[in-house]
């Protein structure tokens, strides 16, 4: 972060307090003594000073203005207001007389009654400023890599199994539980793509483990069973995934598992609370299908609990 403090000539103590705070946070900052007269005549300064000032303005990420009363809409003021507004930079205003013309307050940022009030706000919100700065840095990195910061782009890298790039999306502020444009959660995409490391990572960072896709209404665990992937199914079960979910077509998870007939997966679900008597729209349960299609290994598994 690069903070800029515009300060009036009579605001030395306030400026020192602000500088001390930024220094305590190990944040880069610079100070420009600038009252109304400075803003009115700065554009007439020599070429080198003007270049230095404009370079300073362009590298600024946050700005504090103290003692900025009676500023006329000079070329410099209009430039600063337009630049900071266009870049959506946080600007904090502390008028020396406690009152700032509306044209300035509305154009630039948030007004505080005095420096102590501003410092109180900064102390409270500084972790968020740091978080936002990190996100902006990651967004810039993704841009330079030619990677769009969109849910569909995120899902593409999830499906590829690219953990490093996927982590950048989350660091840039993307929600781990977000869905792509088709309505498929990232955890389901990772599962359907058989990307165990991505599934593990998404669970770890708090992705909604029971989120269902728009297409089939499958959760990640249902996708793991459908893909016949025991390792991912086991991971999801251990993470607390719901074992008795029902798909859009009315199929309970245990019915899907019985259809796949992977004894290892069926045993995993059954022993962790899978309901073998939960029926689909045909009125059939996992137990019923096992008997109908004479899947003896499943019949034995399901009957074992009765003994």
Where are these regions (language model features)?
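C-terminal interaction surface of TIR/SEFIR-family domains
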Residues: 100-167
